[in-house]
Amino acid sequence: MANTEAFFSQTLAERDPELFATITEEQERQETGIELIASENITSKAVLEAQGSVLTNKYAEGYPHRRYYGGCEAVDVTEQLAIDRAKKLFNCEFVNVQPHSGAQANGAVMLALLQPGDTIMGMSLSSGGHLTHGAAPAQSGKWFNAVQYEVSPETLLIDYDAIEAQALECKPKMIIAGGSAIPRQIDFKRFREIADKVGAYLFVDMAHIAGLVATGVHPSPLPHAHVVTTTTHKTLRGPRGGMILSNDLDLGKKINSAVFPGYQGGPLMHVIAGKAVAFGEALKPEFTDYIKQVVANAKALAEVMVERGCDIVTGGTDTHLMLVDLRPKGLKGNAADAALERAGITCNKNGIPFDTEKPMVTSGIRLGTPAATSRGFGIEEFQKVGHLISDVLDGLVEMPEGNPEVEARVLAEVRELCKRFPLYR
């Protein structure tokens, strides 16, 4: 008879010290550094607890009360709780919480509503779109006739008239709105008018702005879109995962079939539990306060970056993120990204609209405020962060291979700032 006592009692530190050391190292990195990657956030301890629960043991193919396995009573309640909370949060009629990621949510929508070879229109990566919106290397770019639209070369804003003209020409079956680097509000009503003119589905990917939509800080796409997807981390501050929403129950049936059995097998019930926790947190008044602070912090950070000699794409931000154009300083995104990381500040190199640099080089960086706001940073702290970033960039102008003296000083200041805002305790 095998001895199961150790299997059920040993901690991770005891059972796998090598992996435990790696996780401890990552926790230290998060604790002592400033996270400005716009697509990242910090979940609550309650979300972590749900994700680490015994629900990870349970297979639950199907949907609540329509499963292919027995023993699903508790997970049925869990999934229904996540669905009901999401419906309330976004004021919609249909929700599927099973997608493992935003990319899989997007893929399931396309599987539900399109046939291979259909024409789709999505924003190009260079203008701020996402890989899954028809970029050439992605499945959506290979399976469909993917037409990409750009922002205006003059204003760098979404040019709705140009998109309408393009749609009238190519007659897409689906128009995709949303992206990964759009700092301004999106006019979903105008997008729906364009879609209706050509008989297309309007599909909105609100992964980046879901928290803003949930709190009314950004207009909701749900009154206008046929279908909406989102991730559940980013500004929603939940576990990494995806979700599909709609007010069309007939489309909802197609989407459910596309998610399972079409695109995925068993749902990750421990992650869905984490989603339920996060949606419950987002329904509380303090989450609205948090999102308002995220946006205020982004505006404050953008103002400092401009004051210190950078350009902000579109001149500012209405959301949680901004694109910093480094060309006025003669810098490249990859060098800035690396220098900032050496100084304890994590962001990502990012192309700017009509960038002439390669994707692994870029002319810009993307900055976001959700994660640092989650740990308690306010406007004063983000103004400080803006100056620290600018110090590193100016040091890089002086010494293009890296400025050890400036980076060491900024790193020390970052460490001191982070001590005031500890994470899990």
Swiss-Prot record:
List the cofactors: pyridoxal 5'-phosphate
Q: Which GO terms describe its cellular component?
A: cytosol
Catalytic class of the enzyme: transferase
* UniProtKB keywords: Amino-acid biosynthesis, Cytoplasm, One-carbon metabolism, Pyridoxal phosphate, Transferase
* Cellular compartment(s): Cytoplasm
Q: Which GO terms describe its biological process?
A: glycine biosynthetic process from serine; tetrahydrofolate interconversion
Q: Where does this protein act, in terms of pathway?
A: One-carbon metabolism; tetrahydrofolate interconversion; Amino-acid biosynthesis; glycine biosynthesis; glycine from L-serine: step 1/1
User: Which Pfam families does this one have?
Assistant: SHMT
Question: Where is (6S)-5,6,7,8-tetrahydrofolate annotated to bind?
Answer: 125, 129-131
Residues the record annotates as the site (Plays an important role in substrate specificity) are 233
Instruction: Please give the residue positions where the record annotates the modification N6-(pyridoxal phosphate)lysine.
Output: 234
Q: Which reaction does it catalyse?
A: (6R)-5,10-methylene-5,6,7,8-tetrahydrofolate + glycine + H2O = (6S)-5,6,7,8-tetrahydrofolate + L-serine
**What EC number is given for this enzyme?**
2.1.2.1
Taxonomic superkingdom:
Bacteria
Task: Provide a Gene Ontology MF annotation, just one.
Answer: pyridoxal phosphate binding
PANTHER family in alphabetical order: SERINE HYDROXYMETHYLTRANSFERASE, SERINE HYDROXYMETHYLTRANSFERASE 1
- Purpose of the protein: Catalyzes the reversible interconversion of serine and glycine with tetrahydrofolate (THF) serving as the one-carbon carrier. This reaction serves as the major source of one-carbon groups required for the biosynthesis of purines, thymidylate, methionine, and other important biomolecules. Also exhibits THF-independent aldolase activity toward beta-hydroxyamino acids, producing glycine and aldehydes, via a retro-aldol mechanism.
Q: Family, per the entry?
A: Belongs to the SHMT family.
Subunit structure and binding partners: Homodimer.
Protein's name in the database = Serine hydroxymethyltransferase
Tell me the organism: Marinomonas sp. (strain MWYL1)
- What gene is this protein translated from? glyA
